A protein has these predicted regions:
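"Short basic amphipathic alpha-helical interaction patches in structured regions
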Residues: 98-107, 143-146, 204
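Active-site diphosphate/adenylate-binding microenvironment
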Residues: 17, 21, 36-87, 95-102, ...
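A short, flexible beta-alpha/helix-coil linker loop
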Residues: 94, 135, 223-226
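Internal, well-ordered alpha/beta segment that forms a basic, Gly-enriched binding/recognition surface
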Residues: 92, 109-166
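Active-site glycine/GP-rich loop and adjacent strand/helix microenvironment
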Residues: 1-14, 18-33, 140-141, 150-359
Length: 359
């Protein structure tokens, strides 16, 4: 089955039992592919004695700690085929992950993102406010996770404006004009959680001005660590934004540069959902066995997308719990889950959190 054929499947209407069969087959195909094209990956699997006979289910596929992409060059393409290099967010002194993409994988990332996000926003492109500054996307050959997020989500915008200038100052006059020009239309806002709080919400609150974004949709992600430290819960975040601009349709997402494209969107009930093209496995920290619904553990993310690098099964540094399977009240099939935050002593990784650490 080609990835184009997989993308033709509905992002949220494949029941988990059927999806398990697809995942097991395609993850094993990717494992064989990367063993044949990435010597370091093959050596790791040889070292643990992995054989195909052991892999009956998705959870049987060996995972790589996501941190390995900071320490090693892991790619399954020759250097001449590198189309784009993605880098993770990182504070000063931290190593960053480098993810090597060929043209096909980069294209699949964008197509996958469109399939997932369009389920939430609709298929029409919308007037769009990017809550960031223009300079973040200037170097398109060496993208940070922040720049990739901005550029990736920009595809959903018909007319776009940046809410901040390069000094990270809110452009209130431009915002007023943009909102007035699109009065009565649905507007899409996108940004990273801490930057929205620091440079959009706080600036609006200080100005005492209330913008009318009551028909808008806000998508945000990138880490909650700094806001948690400031005792701002997701509920308080949503409530505060509604107070200053009337927005009530707010959706968080969970994702990482190591699996760009396969993000997990928050539904109307406040649950993070994995799509048909990826999955989440919760593992116990003691022995990495699979935890049942409701039990906290370390999140593993799997994706059918990565062809140019061995990132199809990754153990994250995040703690979470599975909330249910195929039975979310929103009607979407598959697993839905909650993220509690970083494992203690893990590095800052999210775009929001690493940006917050620099200011």
């Amino acid at each position: 089955m080609t990835y184009e054929e997989i993308l033709a499947l509905s992002p949220y209407q494949v029941p988990q039992m059927k999806k398990q069969v697809l995942l097991a087959r395609e993850l094993m195909r990717l494992t064989r592919h990367h063993r044949g094209h990435c010597q370091a990956y093959d050596r790791m699997l040889t070292a643990i004695g992995f054989t195909e006979r052991e892999a009956e289910n998705p959870e049987d596929i060996p995972f790589l700690p996501v941190r390995l992409f900071k320490e090693m060059e892991l790619r399954s393409i020759p250097s001449k085929d590198i189309f784009k290099t993605m880098t993770s967010s990182g504070t000063s002194g931290q190593n960053v992950s480098k993810i090597y993409l060929d043209r096909a994988t980069a294209s699949y990332q964008q197509k996958t993102l469109v399939r997932i996000v369009s389920d939430m926003t609709g298929s029409a492109r919308l007037p769009m406010i990017l809550i960031d500054c223009p300079s973040v996307v200037q170097n398109r050959a060496m993208f940070s996770a922040r720049g990739a997020g901005i550029l990736g989500f920009s595809i959903f915008g018909r007319k776009k404006m940046y809410a901040l200038n390069d000094n990270m100052e809110l452009q209130l006059d431009s915002l007023r004009e943009f909102i007035a020009a699109h009065r009565g239309e649905k507007i899409l806002l996108f940004g990273f959680t801490f930057m929205i709080w620091q440079h959009f919400y706080r600036a609006l609150a200080a100005s005492k001005e209330k913008l009318d974004l009551s028909t808008a949709v806000l998508i945000h992600g990138g880490g909650w660590k700094r806001l948690t430290q400031e005792a701002v819960s997701p509920e308080q975040f949503n409530s505060a934004l509604k107070e200053v601009c009337g927005i009530s349709h707010i959706s968080n997402y969970y994702g990482m540069v190591e699996q760009t494209g396969c993000i997990c969107m928050e539904c109307e009930k406040g649950h993070l959902h994995v799509s048909t093209y990826s999955d989440v496995i919760v593992r116990r920290g003691l022995d990495f066995s699979v935890a049942p619904v409701g039990e906290k553990g370390i999140l593993e993310v799997v994706s059918l997308l990565p062809e140019s690098y061995p990132g199809h099964a990754l153990l994250t540094e995040d703690e979470g719990a599975l909330l249910g399977v195929d039975d979310c009240p929103c009607g979407r099939k598959g697993k839905y889950f909650k993220v509690f935050g970083r494992i203690q002593h893990a590095e800052l990784r999210g775009c929001s959190d690493t940006y917050a650490a620099k200011i």
